[in-house]
Design a protein with these regions (language model features):
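Bacterial carbohydrate/catabolite-sensing allosteric modules
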Residues: 1-154
Length: 154
C-alpha cells in the first residue's frame, strides 16, 4: 500500500541494499496491505513463479510472513533451506512458528511514549508544533527462517 510508513521503509531498504552493493530487481518488490496474510500469500506465489525467484523474501509485517510461510509449505519447499524469509514487528506469534520467524522487533513502548509526548505538545502548543520524522531503533530477533551465508540456520 502507498503510505508514508511504506514509502519510508522502502526508501530505507533500497538505501541499505545499495550501501551493501545489492541490486534489487523491480519484480522482487510487491505491495500488499499490512497484516494481509492472503495478499502476502498471493505476492509470494508471484515471486516464486518468477524465472529467477528471490532467495529471501522480506515481509512488511509478521502476519504477512505467516501468509508467505503457508504458500511456501504448500509448494513443498523448506524454510530456510529452499528460501529464507523474515518479518517485521516481532509479534509473539513469530516465536511460536516452526521454524521460529526471524523478525525485526520494534520498541513499541518507546514508540507509544514518544507519540504521546508529541501529541501533548501539539495540543498544548499548536502554534509551535512541527512535523518531523523520527527513526526508532529496532532489534533483530534471529529466528531460524534465514539461511546464513555459510549455509547454517540463523
Amino acid at each position: 500500500t502507498d503510505s508514508a510508513v511504506t514509502t519510508n521503509r522502502l526508501s530505507s531498504f533500497y538505501r541499505t541494499a545499495e550501501k551493501f552493493g545489492v541490486e534489487i530487481p523491480d519484480e522482487y518488490v510487491m505491495m500488499t496491505r499490512y497484516r494481509d496474510t492472503k495478499g502476502a500469500g498471493e505476492a509470494t506465489e508471484k515471486l516464486l513463479d518468477l524465472r529467477r525467484p528471490p532467495t529471501c523474501i522480506l515481509y512488511p509485517d509478521d502476519f504477512a510472513a505467516l501468509g508467505g510461510i503457508h504458500v511456501i509449505r504448500e509448494r513443498g519447499m523448506s524454510i530456510p533451506e529452499d528460501i529464507s524469509i523474515a518479518g517485521y514487528d516481532g509479534i509473539r506469534l513469530a516465536k511460536l512458528t516452526v521454524p521460529n520467524l526471524t523478525t525485526l522487533c520494534q520498541d513499541t513502548q518507546h514508540l507509544g511514549q514518544y507519540a504521546a509526548e508529541k501529541l501533548i505538545d501539539l495540543i498544548e502548543k499548536p502554534k509551535t508544533a512541527m512535523r518531523n520524522i523520527t527513526i526508532v531503533q529496532g532489534k533483530l530477533y534471529e529466528g531460524q527462517t534465514v539461511l546464513k551465508l555459510d549455509g547454517s540456520r540463523g
